[in-house]
Curated annotation (Swiss-Prot):
It comes from Caenorhabditis briggsae. This is F-box/WD repeat-containing protein sel-10. Residues 17-35 have a biased composition (Acidic residues). Residues 1-56 are annotated as: Disordered. It comes from the Eukaryota. The keyword Acyltransferase does not apply.
Amino acid sequence: MWPRNDVQMDEGSMTPEDQEPEPAIDQDMEFDVNLEENSYSNGSGSSYNADKLSSSSPLQHKLDLSASPTQNNEANPRVEHLVALFKDLTVAEQMEAFARLVQESNMSNIRQMRAIIEPHFQKDFLSCLPVEIGIKILQNLNSTDLMKVAQVSKNWKMLSEVEKVWKSLEDRGFKNLLEPSDRTRGAWEATAVIPGVNIPDHVNQCEINIHRLVKLLKYGPIYERSADKSRYLRGEKIEKNWHSRPIMGSAILRGHEEHVITCMQIHNDLLVTGSDDNTLKVWSIDDGEVKHTLNGHSGGVWTSQISQCGRYIVSGSTDRTVKVWRAEDGFLLHTLQGHTSTVRCMAMANTTLVTGSRDCTLRVWDIETGLHVRTLQGHQAAVRCVQFDGNIVVSGGYDFTVKIWDAFSGKCLRTLIGHSNRVYSLLYESERSIVCSGSLDTSIRVWDFSRPEGQELIAFLSGHTSLTSGMQLRGNILVSCNADSHVRVWDIYEGTCIHILSGHRSAITSLQWFGRGLVATSSDDGSVKLWDIERGVLIRDLVSLNSGGNGGCIWRLCSTQTMLACAIGSRNNTEETKVILLDFDANHP
């Protein structure tokens, strides 16, 4: 059911870093596999042929020692006669003969029989196989099993350290992890206690450094033996940090005074926040300091985006303009004019921007040149949400419809009709031509617009009792958060609700899916909760405001694989406007 190719770890088991076995081979030796030559090399010129690996295993040695006591003597005619008779027996008769022999033997003979028989059930199959086949087998194991494999023998340990084995796990679980950051400067300094805000405990960095040094002296540098293994084990440590461990650090970013943070994005080391105070702020995540304040709008900023290349920041405002800023220094490059009402939403692919407005239109722009490309007209009311993949534009409006557009011709390809109230949220997955739309009519509709016109609806998901504020889709699993205070987990092909996650006391404002079954949600109740959507259970509260329930709320969430940004404030001045950063990162083992 679950759209996952990753490896599930038993939460109750020992962690992989704790299970790292004491190496049975030279610590300085690095083993690589050349599959064409079927041999190992240790980086120093020496090589280990695969045939040699498989010919001297401990189990093979045991088999040799367990041979018959008479194997070096001349053949015994009486024994040879019995063996010949035995071969002529049927299988059933042979089994009966075995049983009678055991019954007629004394305990000493039975012990010798056992020593001869047992090795046949303990064959070292990895040593008997070509190296590339052994690697293929190990690529199907999880990290805990690979740790156990490494403790069996030198041969098995060498195979378990091969880069390809851990690269396979890394691809299934933790891809594209950025290198660890040393977040100890600026706003990250001495922020373990945040007045009025409850967050997870922080690690004792001194204890961490001592623990790492002890492991390094005992086991040697894992990264040097297998970079992919080190990266994967770091990924598992990060996941455990999210689940239950103390966090690496926290930072408070104060800005926008008592105004609402309306939008927030992360790109590498940049965090961008937009506010109804007419400004945007560009923050450095590494030190938690403001790099630039973007002034220029004459109305509140309601939507913003960072370009995929990271060079541009784009913002839309109630002043009816779109502005393009240079991220490096905050310089205003272009002011895009044309909309006649609030710019409410935007989506970007490369340097092509699509904006949606309360003037019922969408506009396509080139942000490098600042030129207007075309206008998409067809909605009969305000455009509330938009998605864009570079070719296809999907928009949702207050006219209860979802429209599919060709971005370059400007033609409306399809109008999806079915909602009975305003469309507030959209998801678009271009590979499958799937659109998910959430409406004030409380329903979520899943469409496949590659189907014939009129047959696009593939699922009608009912159960929420208010508007859907956020959705994320992976495979057949859709997660939605709603103003009714509940999170629901759906199977879009079955059209069923798998889990209802209850715990928030007020409207849910934002949702972030980290993969591997972890979802974080924020709420007007002043909390951020982490859920396991596979089991349908609450893992823990990541943030809890003392002012929650009295006006303090979490407006927005934004995340990377190692960090969570929470936009915090209130509508009645009970909570200071700020962004809290929580660092769940881990160093290489």
